[in-house]
C-alpha cells in the first residue's frame, strides 16, 4: 500500500525533472547574454560545451562570441563568430567589449556593442528558440523545430564528431594561437568535389599552389567526422577516402576535435575526459593523426614563402607532431611573436661597390647542416668546384646562399628572399649561407688574400725604388703603363662588341671557334637541323668532359645575327628546371655558335610521334613541365619573355624525361611595365595564334595558344594536322578534340591507350584546359599561372566554349 502512495510523488518528480531538462535544452525568445557576470554563456545539457562570450587570450577587455569545451581547463575554442571585412569575401573575428549584449528576440539572434550598434547576426529570421547541443553544435530553430542556422554549417578552424562539411565550405587556420584572424592556410571542400589544402597569403587571401589534395574532382561529396572518430571524404558512388585513420578504444572516454592549425597541418586531437582514460593519457590535447605527415616537405610554391616565412626554414618533430620555423645563422625573426613574417640578416647588407678582395675579407660562406631552400636560384655554374662556388657567391652582392652538388660539380646561387626553406636529413647537397666574417675566423681565401697583400707591398716598394733611381727607367715605366692602359681599353671594347649584354651576373662562357670545332670532332655528329642552323653533338675537352649540343648558325644574315643575339640575351639570363641551359657561345669573326646542355632523349617531336606511344604518366610529366617553363618566362623573369615559337621540336627531354623549352631565337623581351608588343609574324604553321594575322598587339597569350595545341598532341600522341587519317573529321586535331569533348566521348581521343583510359578524368581535364588555351580571342585564354592550376586540379575548370572554326595557323 505504501508503494502506491509513493507513486504520485514519483510521477511529480519525473515531471519536474523533465521540465528542468527542457529548460536547459531550449533557449527561449527573450534570453540574453553579456560578457561579464554569471549570465555570459549557454551550456549544453551535459555541460561539455558552452556558447557565449569568451575572453580573448591576453586581453581581458575583449571578448569573442564562441563555442568552447566547457569542462577543460583552457576552455578550448572550437567555433567563433566572424563577419565580412568591408564587404569583401574575407572575414574577421567578431570581438566586442564589456557592455555588449547578445539577445534572442523578435525571431532573431543579434549581437550589439555597448553603443547599440549591431555587429553580428546569423542572417536568419523567424527563430523560435535555440539549443546548445552536447555535440558542440549551436542551433537556431524555427517554431516547427526546423534548423534555421547552426554553427556546424559555418565552421571556423575546427570540426567535431558528427560534423559534416558540404561542398563550398572551408576551414581557415588562425593567424596565431591567440589571434583569431584568418591565417595562412585553408582546407576547402571545393564545389568541384576536390578536397584541397592551400597556403593563403596574408592579408590579401590569395591562394597559392595547393600542398595537398584528395584528387577527387567531380567525385567528392562531403567531409565527415563520424561518431567513431574517423574523418573521411565521401565519394558520390558511396565509397570513402580516409583523411585521418586515428583509432581510440573508447569514444566516450575522450573529447575529440580536428583543427587546421596555424602551421597548416590538419590535426586530429583527443583529450581524456574521465578517470578511466586519464591514467593512460596526459591531461592535455594529444594529436593522434596529422595531414600532411610532413608539412615542410609538402609545401613548395613558386610564389609565396612556403611553410614558414621568407629567409627562414621549417623543421618538424615527428615524435611530437609539431612544426617549428627557425632562422639560419646570423639571422633573426622580423617579429618574434609573428614568426610567419620571416627572418632578416642581423648584419648590414653587402655593398655592391666592394671589390673582390674586400668582399672576401668581410664575408664568408658558412655551411648549414641538412637545410635547403630549393627555389630562389638565379645563377647556375657547371662544371665547378666548391671553392669557386663559395667565391662566386661571396663577391656577388645579390647572392645570399650558394648550393654545391659534388656529384654533378654544379653550383647554384640564390638571392633574397629565400623561400620554401626546410630541414631535411636527406639533403644531398652542400648549402652555404653568406655571413659576416669575424675577425678571428679562418677563411678559405685567407692565404690567397695575404699573398696578394704581400705581393702588393713588395710591388709598391720596388716601384718606388725604380722611380727614384733613374729618369730613363721612369720614362720606360710610364710608357709601359700607358701601353698597358691602351691595351686594356681596347680589350674591353672588343669584349663589349663580341659579347651581348647580360645584366643577371656573369655571362655564359665565351668559347673560341677552335674549342668548339675540337669539342664536336669537326662538327661531325648531327643532332638536328633548323631554319637558322645545324645542331651538333660534342664533348667539352676539360677534366669533366660533359656532353654538349652546339648550334652552328649557317648563314650570317641580319636576321640570323638578330636571332643569335636574342637567344643569348634571353636564355643567357634565365635559369629554370624547364628551360634548356645555355652554357656559352662563340661570336668570333663571322662564326656564330651557341652551346647548350645536351639532352639525351632528344625532342618532344621524336618522343611523341614515334611508332610506340609514350606512357601516359610521362606525357603528363612533360605537359606540366612545359607549362611551368612558360609560367616562368611570362611571370617570374625580370623581364617578361614571349617565346613566339612553341612547338614539339623546341621542347627537349633530359635523362629523366624532364621537359626543357629551347630555341629562343624568335623570342620577345618585354619591359616590366609593358604587356604587349608589335612584331611581324613568327612561329610555325599549325601552332601560331590567330592574332599573328591581325593588326593587334602580341601578348604572352600567343604562347598559351601554342601550348594548347601541344597539350592536345600530348594527350592524343598525334600531330595537330594529319592528312592520311581514315576519318576526315579527325584530320585537324583541334576540331576533333572539341567535337569529342562536346559529345562526351573523350575516350575516342585516347582509344587503345589503356593507361590514359584508366585516367580518363585527367584526360578530360587536360582536353578542357587545351580548349581554353585555343580560344580565338586572346583575352579568353587563361594565363599560364591559371593553366598550371587547372592542370594540377587546384581550381575548377568551367566548360570551355567552342574555339573559333577559323584555325589561323593553317591559313
From Swiss-Prot:
Q: Which UniProt keywords apply?
A: ATP-binding, Disulfide bond, EGF-like domain, Glycoprotein, Kinase, Lectin, Membrane, Nucleotide-binding, Plant defense, Receptor, Serine/threonine-protein kinase, Signal, Transferase, Transmembrane, Transmembrane helix
Q: Where is the active site?
A: 645
Q: Where is the Bulb-type lectin domain?
A: 24-153
Q: What is its main location?
A: membrane
Any idea where this protein resides?
Membrane
Which Gene Ontology cellular component annotation is one that this UniProt entry carries? membrane
Q: Which residues form the signal peptide?
A: 1-23
Q: Where is the EGF-like domain?
A: 292-344
- Tell me the superkingdom of the source: Eukaryota
Would you list which residues are glycosylated?
A: 26, 39, 59, 219, 226, 237, 242, 321
Q: Where is the Protein kinase domain?
A: 521-795
Disulphide bonds annotated for this chain are: 296-314, 308-325, 327-343, 389-411, 393-399
Similarity comment text for this entry = Belongs to the protein kinase superfamily. Ser/Thr protein kinase family.
- Name the UniProt record assigns to this protein: G-type lectin S-receptor-like serine/threonine-protein kinase LECRK3
Recorded name of the encoding gene: LECRK3
Amino acid at each position: 500500500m505504501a508503494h502506491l502512495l509513493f507513486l504520485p510523488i514519483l510521477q511529480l518528480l519525473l515531471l519536474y525533472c523533465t521540465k528542468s531538462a527542457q529548460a536547459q535544452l531550449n533557449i527561449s525568445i527573450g534570453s540574453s547574454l553579456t560578457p561579464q557576470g554569471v549570465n555570459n554563456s549557454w551550456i549544453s545539457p551535459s555541460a561539455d560545451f558552452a556558447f557565449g562570450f569568451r575572453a580573448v587570450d591576453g586581453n581581458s577587455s575583449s571578448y569573442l562570441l564562441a563555442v568552447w569545451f566547457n569542462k577543460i581547463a583552457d576552455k578550448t575554442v572550437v567555433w567563433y563568430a566572424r563577419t565580412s571585412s568591408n564587404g569583401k569575401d574575407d572575414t574577421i573575428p567578431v570581438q566586442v567589449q564589456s557592455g555588449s549584449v547578445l539577445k534572442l528576440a523578435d525571431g532573431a539572434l543579434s549581437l550589439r556593442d555597448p553603443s547599440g550598434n549591431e555587429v553580428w547576426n546569423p542572417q536568419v529570421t523567424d527563430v523560435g528558440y535555440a539549443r546548445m547541443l552536447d555535440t558542440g553544435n549551436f542551433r537556431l530553430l524555427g517554431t516547427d523545430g526546423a534548423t534555421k542556422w547552426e554553427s556546424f554549417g559555418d565552421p571556423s578552424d575546427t570540426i567535431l564528431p558528427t560534423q559534416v562539411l558540404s561542398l563550398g565550405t572551408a576551414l581557415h587556420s588562425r593567424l596565431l594561437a591567440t589571434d583569431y584572424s584568418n591565417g595562412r592556410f585553408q582546407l576547402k571542400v571545393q564545389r568541384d568535389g576536390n578536397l584541397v589544402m592551400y597556403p593563403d597569403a596574408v592579408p590579401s587571401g590569395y591562394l597559392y599552389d595547393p600542398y595537398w589534395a584528395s584528387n577527387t574532382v567531380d567525385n567528392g561529396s562531403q567531409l565527415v567526422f563520424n561518431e567513431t572518430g574517423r574523418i573521411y571524404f565521401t565519394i558520390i558512388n558511396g565509397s570513402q577516402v580516409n583523411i585521418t585513420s586515428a583509432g581510440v578504444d573508447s569514444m566516450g572516454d575522450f573529447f575529440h576535435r580536428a583543427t587546421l592549425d596555424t602551421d597548416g597541418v590538419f590535426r586530429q586531437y583527443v583529450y581524456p575526459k574521465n578517470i578511466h582514460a586519464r591514467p593512460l593519457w596526459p591531461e592535455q590535447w594529444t594529436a593522434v593523426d596529422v595531414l600532411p605527415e610532413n608539412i615542410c616537405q609538402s609545401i613548395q610554391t613558386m610564389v609565396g614563402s612556403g611553410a614558414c616565412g621568407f629567409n627562414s626554414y621549417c623543421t618538424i618533430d615527428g615524435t611530437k607532431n609539431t612544426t617549428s620555423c627557425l632562422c639560419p645563422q646570423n639571422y633573426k625573426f622580423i617579429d618574434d611573436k609573428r614568426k610567419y613574417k620571416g627572418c632578416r640578416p642581423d648584419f648590414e647588407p653587402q655593398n655592391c661597390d666592394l671589390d673582390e678582395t674586400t668582399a672576401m675579407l668581410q664575408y664568408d660562406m658558412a655551411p648549414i647542416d641538412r637545410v635547403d631552400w630549393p627555389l630562389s636560384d638565379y645563377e647556375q655554374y657547371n662544371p665547378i668546384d666548391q671553392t669557386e662556388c663559395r667565391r662566386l657567391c661571396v663577391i656577388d652582392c645579390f647572392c645570399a646562399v650558394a648550393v654545391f652538388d659534388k656529384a654533378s660539380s654544379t653550383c647554384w646561387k640564390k638571392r633574397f628572399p629565400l623561400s620554401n626553406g626546410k630541414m631535411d636529413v636527406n639533403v644531398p647537397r652542400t648549402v652555404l649561407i653568406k655571413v659576416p666574417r669575424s675577425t678571428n675566423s679562418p677563411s678559405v681565401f685567407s692565404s690567397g688574400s695575404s699573398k696578394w697583400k704581400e705581393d702588393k707591398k713588395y710591388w709598391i716598394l720596388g716601384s718606388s725604388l725604380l722611380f727614384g733611381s733613374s729618369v730613363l727607367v721612369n720614362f720606360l715605366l710610364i710608357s709601359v703603363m700607358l701601353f698597358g692602359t691602351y691595351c686594356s681599353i681596347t680589350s674591353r671594347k672588343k669584349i663589349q662588341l663580341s659579347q651581348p649584354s647580360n645584366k643577371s651576373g656573369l655571362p655564359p662562357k665565351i668559347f673560341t671557334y677552335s674549342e668548339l670545332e675540337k669539342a664536336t670532332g669537326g662538327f661531325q655528329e648531327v643532332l638536328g637541323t633548323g631554319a637558322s642552323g645545324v645542331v651538333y653533338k660534342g664533348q667539352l675537352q676539360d677534366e669533366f668532359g660533359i656532353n654538349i649540343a652546339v648550334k652552328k648558325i649557317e648563314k650570317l644574315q641580319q636576321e640570323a645575327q638578330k636571332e643569335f643575339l636574342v637567344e643569348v640575351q634571353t636564355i643567357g639570363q634565365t635559369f629554370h628546371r624547364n628551360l634548356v641551359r645555355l652554357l656559352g657561345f662563340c661570336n668570333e669573326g663571322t662564326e656564330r655558335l651557341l652551346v647548350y646542355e645536351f639532352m639525351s632523349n632528344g625532342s618532344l617531336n621524336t618522343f611523341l610521334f614515334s611508332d610506340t606511344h609514350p606512357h601516359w604518366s610521362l606525357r603528363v610529366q612533360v605537359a606540366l613541365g612545359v607549362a611551368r617553363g612558360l609560367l616562368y618566362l611570362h611571370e617570374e623573369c625580370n623581364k617578361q619573355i614571349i617565346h613566339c615559337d612553341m612547338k614539339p621540336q623546341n621542347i627537349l627531354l633530359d635523362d629523366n624525361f624532364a621537359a626543357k623549352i629551347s630555341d629562343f631565337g624568335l623570342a620577345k623581351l618585354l619591359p616590366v611595365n609593358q604587356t604587349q608588343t608589335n612584331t611581324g609574324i613568327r612561329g610555325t604553321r599549325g601552332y601560331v595564334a590567330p592574332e599573328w594575322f591581325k593588326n593587334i598587339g602580341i601578348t604572352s597569350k600567343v604562347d598559351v595558344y601554342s601550348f594548347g595545341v601541344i597539350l592536345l598532341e600530348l594527350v592524343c600522341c598525334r600531330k595537330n594536322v594529319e592528312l592520311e587519317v581514315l576519318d576526315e573529321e579527325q584530320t585537324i586535331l583541334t576540331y576533333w578534340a572539341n567535337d569529342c569533348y562536346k559529345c562526351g566521348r573523350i575516350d575516342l581521343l585516347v582509344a587503345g591507350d589503356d593507361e590514359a583510359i584508366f585516367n580518363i578524368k585527367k584526360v578530360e581535364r587536360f582536353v578542357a584546359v587545351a580548349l581554353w588555351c585555343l580560344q580565338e580571342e586572346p583575352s579568353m585564354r587563361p594565363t599560364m599561372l591559371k593553366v598550371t592550376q587547372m592542370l594540377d586540379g587546384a581550381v575548377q575548370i568551367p566548360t570551355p566554349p567552342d574555339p573559333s572554326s577559323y584555325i589561323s595557323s593553317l591559313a
